[in-house]
């Protein structure tokens, strides 16, 4: 059985009822940007309504349930050092489950461990002798860990690959570890993403843990939404256009509001704003989830393709990260595909299974495909740093991960920035 996890009905207001009143603010989009904006405006005492065409909150950050397994819509993680996430979220209530600080790299027929020497000193010392880069490369990683790549965060724009070469990394280190690792973050393996995004996420990797909520990434937007007052969400309703003094829904209903915040994905935001926003290109991804009788890796660790052959870029046994992701006695394997992400399911499944057999042997024949998520607009492809101001015009604002170097954290920060801009202008008008 497959179903989307949703909030309780008490949180949701029907569009017809919403149209009977006027709001201080209507927020279009119930992703993490829109919900963060709503939280900030609610704390300031504004009467608001969040509208989304989907049947649940979260946008791209959602978790489905399939035969007792929790399936995030694409492999996603939370970096615990994200400053905005620390501000907005209650980590204890999320019951975060942390990944091993390092990775397993599949290279030349074997799994090679790369460990953070600051958190796993013994394993880090042993990894010095594996063929995933030279000793000098490992020392450069340590240096970059302490510097956080700050010198790449300012100055002329350059791509991540150039930044790595400026750091002195060898081709072996880049191809066997950094390309698949950062490729899994950016969802592109050419590493053309701006080095400013690289510097931003590298600092967070160095300063904290990689984690997921025990019950799936969807718990993050669900926690944000749970803080809103009853009836502040209008789900299953699509905003067709902005109108004078509010928004018009696709069913013809109009909802009056003094202010409107567009918190949708970039393409939809551009449509609603009549070309006032230039939407970025996006990187796509496929994520395939498999049910396995036993876990092929018995630890909460990220596995990387260091050979560069086959469709899989990275793999994780999610049930080893959090037992909640799979029913008792079963394992959940997540495989991320970048280069061939758009392939049809039967074609991609055959190629992925062939790689499974190469990595894990005949046990992979017994694995059952649960679901294939093909996500066309997964992450904005940013070769330069976008700087989208939250104010579009009087009473209209925009937020989302496309407004800054894209991440879960920047989406939250963008939502709060839009709320702050709105409140400042509202105070000035008063």
Q: How would you label these PLM feature ranges?
A:
Residues 82-86, 90, 94-191, 205-207:
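Mobile amphipathic helical/loop "lid" adjacent to a hydrophobic cofactor/ligand pocket
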Residues 62-80, 141-151:
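Glycine-rich active-site loop/strand segments that organize a redox cofactor
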Residues 42-66:
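Glycine-rich FAD pyrophosphate-binding loop
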Residues 23-50, 423:
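N-terminal Rossmann-like FAD-binding beta1-loop-alpha1 element of flavoenzymes
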